[in-house]
């Protein structure tokens, strides 16, 4: 913790009271069990409400409690303006460090500048900017590689045949753009992307997209879906249209997703543990604040391509 944290906390009491009111609709406080005046105080700004984000929040909360840190949290609900407002509110609460799961990589520049001007370190999860000089650290997921792993499975399964591929992306920005970019970039020349539409990380929207996709492309061979929640809806739409043979590859590695791989509903998923990201973010933020030389600024979260053959190797996705 920075030496000035106690004095900054005292100076911002009135602002913190205002921030508590501002955050009451979208944030929460978790006193993790330590002495509030003597422990690290962290602010976690989450990006959305998908299953991934819910598991990430749970992991951050549980790890903060274990580390005896006080935690404030807020949700930006896929809106970059709300994200910056949440960061401003956390600054007013005078946290010792911010942990941010951004809604959009382009929003990070403003986030980092705002935190820097307030003298508060910022730690990023999942994605990062190319310039990390003003960042405390990052728990980084190579989302391009996640997409590429799914594309590699298709290349192997297609075995040189000409195939048609559909993409159900998430919401434009951050995770979805990186996933889809990595997937498209790694597809073999024999795989043609014939449809690419955003499902907005919303199962109902994804199902509608899939219904239109299979109607327009009845001979579709494969579909890449940007998360498992949407993938279940896409599977439902394809099956209802008699397209049970379309093979779906996706990303997450939830218990439900692994069961779908086992049953054959999904052909493959890339396990990207929200629990590991949250644990790493909290522990490394505290370690870096304490100038622990054993803690790396950049922590790479491992990815695992999961098929029927290696379901048991998938990491735990969400805290129980």
Please name every model-derived segment.
Residues 2-12, 19-21, 26-320:
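A residue-level marker of the well-folded mature domains of exported/periplasmic proteins
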